[in-house]
Amino acid sequence: MTKRKKEVIDVDCSEKKDFVIDWSSAMDKEDEVPELEIVNTTKPTPPPPPTFFSDDQTDSPKLLTDRDLDEQLERKKAILTLGPGLPDKGEKIRLKIADLEEEKQRRVLEGSKMEVDRSSKVVSSTSSGSDVLPQGNAVSKDTSRGNADSKDTSRQGNADSKEVSRSTFSAVFSKPKTDSQSKKAFGKELEDLGCERRKHKAGRKPVTRLSNGWRLLPDVGKAEHSAKQFDSGLKESKGNKKSKEPYGKKRPMESSTYSLIDDDDDDDDDDDNDTSGHETPREWSWEKSPSQSSRRRKKSEDTVINVDEEEAQPSTVAEQAAELPEGLQEDICYPTRDDPHFVQVCLKDLECLAPREYLTSPVMNFYMRFLQQQISSSNQISADCHFFNTYFYKKLSDAVTYKGNDKDAFFVRFRRWWKGIDLFRKAYIFIPIHEDLHWSLVIVCIPDKKDESGLTILHLDSLGLHSRKSIVENVKRFLKDEWNYLNQDDYSLDLPISEKVWKNLPRRISEAVVQVPQQKNDFDCGPFVLFFIKRFIEEAPQRLKRKDLGMFDKKWFRPDEASALRIKIRNTLIELFRVSDQTE
């Protein structure tokens, strides 16, 4: 090993040794250890993370100022005039308007409440102080203060409302206390705020009275569901009570309002529906109805009724809901399975007869068939009527708007719906309409041979939601197509109506616009259609003439009569299920 390598090894060994410090020699014994000093330092608060709002949050009425709230409300109402042309027919706009009006009303009530609380505190501090004056002194003091304030009107502008509120409440406490005052000390104030009315009508939503004598009913879509456990057989006394809404006042020399429209139709088709064929009525009677959840209509429009035109009418005793027994069979066929036009009803279909539910096609078709069976024995008019089921109008609409090259063959297949029935020999044809989750009714009135007034089409709608013009137009085209088909044969040898009317039938079909009772909610359109049929069959003459149109009126029957039909149909079906279960 060389000397140089040995020196390198010695250096490396010395570097690897621990370095030891002699603190006793490095530090003097008299030196003191410095004290630890803790200094509080405030770190700057980090800026909050950016907040991202969704469209719903930015459009929330609570985030708007009063001015912006009023501007949005006016703008939405202006847009609502275009509702029929919108994809959802203005439904979303109506809901937005309802939210804005609710927020505006909340702010008004909240501001009034804050003013009352502030005035109450002023009154409390005044009455508890030692300088409470008698009534005369208080009046003189207020008078003198008023004179002093009148000298400087520039400082009075912002305090006018507060001074009026304070003086009003102070006057209540400055007067001698009497029994009547103790009971109605704040009667006027509570009446202005609407609290007195809510006290007498607990649990009910307030009715807004407008300056023109009309009243604004709350949104029926937000009403509370009062009927529970309906299918379990619980008797709903509240659900069966007749509506307490006042009804129409009879005016002297008042007749029904209607007009006759007799115009020629153009044969231009509106829609292009390419449909291959039509099923028979029997095939359609087994079709599943849409679920009840999809039948909910959202309606946020307020209903306005005229108080001056209504008065209370004695309501009839409502029929009680029967209990639903257990162990019933799943379905029945009415009147029997052997009947060629029987209607099948499942036990589950009874759910639509619960309060606030929308009637389904099986129940509607059942009751129309039930009316035919019940009235035929006592009234001859039922034999001269033809009832199409609830699925017919959709097929009618497809047939009259079909634009294929085989239009004639298409109509021949469509005629299977009334195979073997001469429609023009009937006195009345009933066509139920179901569109946009709403029910309405069309009645075709056919005259006899002595009457040359022509055919009349009636459209009865308890809410006025359906397009009367398009529905009547489709029915007219249907009657014309049937007339063209029958004219190809020797049908004219034995005409059921006047020869003059028959030769010019396309121009002798008119529409009579009539007024009918209107429902007070948005879920009784089905019972109203069935009650229209029931009442019409009971009261209509053998053949309807123009002079008979006076039977139609908004006071034709009470709305609660039609609403009560829901319970009657349910009880009838339960009894039929019982009888069918016993026989089988």
Curated annotation (Swiss-Prot):
Organism name: Arabidopsis thaliana (Mouse-ear cress)
Gene Ontology CC terms: nuclear speck; nucleus
PANTHER family: UBIQUITIN-LIKE PROTEASE 4, UBIQUITIN-LIKE PROTEASE 4-RELATED
Region: Disordered, residue numbers: 28-64, 99-323
Residue stretches of biased makeup (Basic residues): 197-207
Outcome after substituting residue 525 to S: Loss of peptidase activity
Keywords: Hydrolase, Nucleus, Protease, Thiol protease, Ubl conjugation pathway
Residue spans of biased composition, Low complexity class: 121-132
Compositional bias segments (type: Acidic residues): 261-274
E.C. numbers: 3.4.22.-
Chief location category: nucleus
Active site: 438, 461, 525
Protein name: Ubiquitin-like-specific protease 1D
Superkingdom of origin organism: Eukaryota
Induction field: Constitutively expressed. Proteasomally degraded upon salt stress.
InterPro entries in the record: Papain-like_cys_pep_sf, Peptidase_C48_C
Alphabetical list of Gene3D superfamilies matching this protein: 1.10.418.20, Ubiquitin-related (3.30.310.130)
UniProt record similarity statement: Belongs to the peptidase C48 family.
Record remark on domains: The N-terminal regulatory domain is not required for peptidase activity in vitro.
Record's subcellular location: Nucleus speckle
Short name of one Pfam family: Peptidase_C48
Enzyme class: hydrolase
Phenotype seen when the gene is deleted: No visible phenotype in terms of overall growth, salt sensitivity and flowering time. Early flowering time and salt sensitivity in ulp1d/ots1 and ulp1c/ots2 double mutants.
Single GO BP term: response to salt stress
Function field: Protease that catalyzes two essential functions in the SUMO pathway: processing of full-length SUMOs to their mature forms and deconjugation of SUMO from targeted proteins. Cleaves precursors of SUM1 and SUM2, but not of SUM3 or SUM5. Able to release SUM1 and SUM2 from conjugates, but unable to cleave SUM3. Protease activity mainly directed at deconjugating SUM1 and SUM2 from their target proteins. Regulates salt stress responses and flowering time. Redundant with ULP1C.
Gene: ULP1D
UniProt keyword Plastid present: no
